[in-house]
């Protein structure tokens, strides 16, 4: 299952690899585009992340996937980790590729003079911002310009997963991001990934994380069981 799938491009990519995929997003307009893009190859469900276990009928999956720019819209990372656990079969895997919380803490309005402006750690109150354009190539204006977002520190994310009964199997920080996040300070490689032109080792801009659901909330180890649906 692909959480916060938006218009479903990553969801469709998983389907093309042979997976039976369910995409979940709370935006009906996004899912309209996703269904037009994927046709019958993917099942799309309209719901917010925290409602996913109930909306999906307590169905369990082999894999939960979350992509870049998703976790920042969630106010409670510990609650999210529990949702992910509830969606997985014992032995099921979580895979995340996300923007690094260091990147989200930067003020990106002037890439020539970067400064830490926003919280690195999760806060009770959201960061409220106003956006004039979307990352989608379009000449249409944004109708709902006010956004509410929350950052989550890397340690907070890992600890939330461990406390929910996951075993962390891989965590990598990366120097590249799939868009020009820092204006004139980044250059694209042959894959279309952007890194700092000078000394890219200075700044992590994305990370990937893999974890396996192995432990129940009480601390006992669960035996692997069959999946009711795979993705």
Segments from the language model and where they lie:
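Class I SAM-dependent methyltransferase SAM/SAH-binding core
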Residues: 1-53
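A short acidic, Gly/Pro-enriched loop at the edge of an enzyme's catalytic core
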Residues: 54-64
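A short SAM/SAH-binding and catalytic strip from SAM-dependent methyltransferases
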Residues: 62-78
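A short glycine-rich, Lys/Arg-flanked "PGG" loop and its adjoining helix->strand segment in the class I
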Residues: 78-93
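Conserved class I S-adenosyl-L-methionine
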Residues: 93-135
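Acceptor-substrate binding/catalytic loop of class I
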Residues: 98-112, 140-156
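Short alpha-helix
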Residues: 147-171
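Core SAM-dependent methyltransferase catalytic element
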Residues: 164-166, 188-190, 194, 198-225
